[in-house]
Design a protein with these regions (language model features):
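Extracellular/surface-associated beta-sandwich interaction domains
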Residues: 1-199
Length: 199
């Protein structure tokens, strides 16, 4: 059954990304819906295979300036994250399964977080953020000799014929970085371990 069904292995449930623009930074937050995902096409003891989150950032609607990691043939394939966190479970480094000569990076046991503050932004520019949840795939087995590479959520940005953004997936945020208006009192935020409190 694995030989016929493995190709339908699916990424974790898509998280919802929330973004707030501040002066010189953008605060990104999300929930934990992805972490209880079950992949029914994997062996029963491996079905809860969520591993972590990555955030990709681009100033391009097609996310092209983030797609800089190439495959073994030199073709753009993977996006370079500006943030990554993963479960503390001993699953670290690169996946055992390669795709066109390239392995997916699974993390370094940092611990799962639900926020990120991007302080490397310029006021007056628009940024596109994609938050993806990913799993650890499946190492080669007797049933699946090639194994299953890790998978992550898609980042969907829908454009009209004039290339204006008309919609995005729940895990994508389009944010205009701007300085606060005169007299504006910014909300405060504090970080306590994995919690981000905004007031």
């Amino acid at each position: 059954i694995y030989e016929t069904d493995y190709r339908f292995a699916q990424p974790p449930r898509m998280p919802t990304l929330t973004a707030e623009s501040k002066d010189g930074s953008i605060v990104l937050t999300w929930g934990n819906v992805s972490e209880s995902s079950r992949d029914p096409f994997l062996p029963e003891d491996l079905q809860y295979d969520f591993e972590g989150y990555k955030i990709y950032r681009s100033t391009d609607k097609y996310l092209k300036d983030a797609q800089i990691i190439t495959d073994g043939y030199g073709n753009p394939m993977f996006y370079e994250p500006i943030f990554q966190c993963d479960k503390v479970d001993g699953i670290t480094g690169f996946s055992d399964v390669t795709v066109f000569g390239t392995s997916y990076y699974l993390g370094s046991d940092t611990g799962v977080k639900h926020h990120f503050i991007d302080a490397d932004v310029i006021n007056g520019k628009t940024y596109y953020y994609a938050l993806v949840a990913y799993d650890y795939g499946l190492s080669p087995t007797d049933e699946i000799a090639t194994g299953i590479p890790p998978s992550e959520n898609n980042a969907i940005i829908e454009l009209d014929e004039n290339e204006y953004v008309i919609s995005t997936g729940p895990n994508v945020a389009q944010v205009y970085a701007k300085a606060p208006s005169a007299g504006y009192v910014s909300s405060t935020f504090e970080i306590d371990d994995n919690k981000l409190n905004i007031g």
